[in-house]
């Protein structure tokens, strides 16, 4: 009973912080967990997170000497992998969390990646700038996913690719109770032990369960104008990677 009460309290606390607008609360949250973000990702995903990032970069494709943007870049893993995979590309990593960007700059110093503070709701780039735009764990953390997708569509060149990695609510099948238990209790507990921030990871769990299904997210891509939209699920259906073409 005590564990259930604590979990419910954390969910209510997180909803109070984010109900009006996710922006300020999410920015503050990511600033707070920046130092332990990478370790927590590895533990929480059982080491599968790098595999997913490689899949994202492969789906983005080789931009040649063109420009690519990794939004919600966090501590820079996808941007750095893009740079290593396609060394001729001009890579920009953007995030609205300054602390996350500071971690990215320290981790990948001297690699020629352009790190920029930017808001996905209003990108500081001209129309038709990028050959590809990637992002991980962005759309679940914004107020209006359709608006952000429209903004990504705007800055992509015609024929450019958008690739999105995010959590998705698992299907309600025979293993659903076990997945739900891990999200509701396991992840917040890991957050408390590793990142010293149980509330932030209770938010992750709650927002995942309330986020769009992979099918609905694919429809949002199409609604923003993207064509040839596909997706692939990972980790018992709790991770989805979507991609589409402008």
Swiss-Prot record:
Gene3D superfamilies: Vaccinia Virus protein VP39 (3.40.50.150). S-adenosyl-L-methionine binds at residues 75, 95, 119-120. It comes from the Bacteria. Its EC number is 2.1.1.163, 2.1.1.201. The keyword tRNA-binding does not apply. It catalyses: a 2-demethylmenaquinol + S-adenosyl-L-methionine = a menaquinol + S-adenosyl-L-homocysteine + H(+); a 2-methoxy-6-(all-trans-polyprenyl)benzene-1,4-diol + S-adenosyl-L-methionine = a 5-methoxy-2-methyl-3-(all-trans-polyprenyl)benzene-1,4-diol + S-adenosyl-L-homocysteine + H(+). NCBIfam families: MenG_MenH_UbiE (TIGR01934), PRK00216.1-5 (NF001244). The keyword Transcription regulation does not apply. Pathway: Quinol/quinone metabolism; menaquinone biosynthesis; menaquinol from 1,4-dihydroxy-2-naphthoate: step 2/2; Cofactor biosynthesis; ubiquinone biosynthesis. It comes from Desulfotalea psychrophila (strain LSv54 / DSM 12343). Keywords: Menaquinone biosynthesis, Methyltransferase, S-adenosyl-L-methionine, Transferase, Ubiquinone biosynthesis. Belongs to the class I-like SAM-binding methyltransferase superfamily. MenG/UbiE family. Methyltransferase required for the conversion of demethylmenaquinol (DMKH2) to menaquinol (MKH2) and the conversion of 2-polyprenyl-6-methoxy-1,4-benzoquinol (DDMQH2) to 2-polyprenyl-3-methyl-6-methoxy-1,4-benzoquinol (DMQH2). This is Ubiquinone/menaquinone biosynthesis C-methyltransferase UbiE. One of its GO terms (biological process) is methylation.
């Amino acid at each position: 009973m005590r564990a259930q009460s604590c979990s419910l309290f954390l969910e209510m606390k997180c909803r109070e912080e984010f109900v009006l607008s996710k922006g300020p609360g999410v920015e503050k949250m990511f600033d707070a967990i920046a130092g332990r973000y990478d370790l927590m990702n590895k533990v929480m995903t059982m080491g599968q997170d790098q595999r997913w990032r490689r899949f994202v970069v492969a789906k983005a494709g080789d931009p040649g000497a063109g420009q690519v943007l990794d939004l919600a870049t966090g501590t820079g893993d996808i941007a750095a992998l893009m740079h290593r995979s396609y060394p001729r590309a001009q890579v920009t990593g953007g995030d609205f969390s300054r602390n996350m960007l500071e971690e990215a700059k320290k981790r990948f110093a001297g690699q020629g990646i352009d790190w920029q503070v930017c808001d996905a709701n209003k990108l500081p780039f001209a129309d038709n700038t990028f050959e590809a735009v990637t992002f991980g764990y962005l759309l679940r953390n914004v107020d209006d996913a359709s608006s952000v997708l429209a903004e990504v569509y705007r800055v992509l060149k015609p024929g450019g690719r958008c690739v999105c990695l995010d959590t998705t609510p698992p299907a309600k099948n025979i293993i659903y109770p076990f997945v739900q238990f891990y999200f509701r209790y396991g992840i917040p507990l890991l957050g408390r032990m590793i990142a010293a921030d149980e509330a932030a990871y209770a938010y992750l769990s709650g927002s995942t369960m309330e986020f769009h299904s992979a099918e609905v997210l694919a429809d949002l891509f199409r609604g923003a104008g993207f064509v040839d939209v596909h997706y692939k699920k990972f980790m018992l259906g709790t991770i989805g990677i979507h991609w589409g073409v402008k």
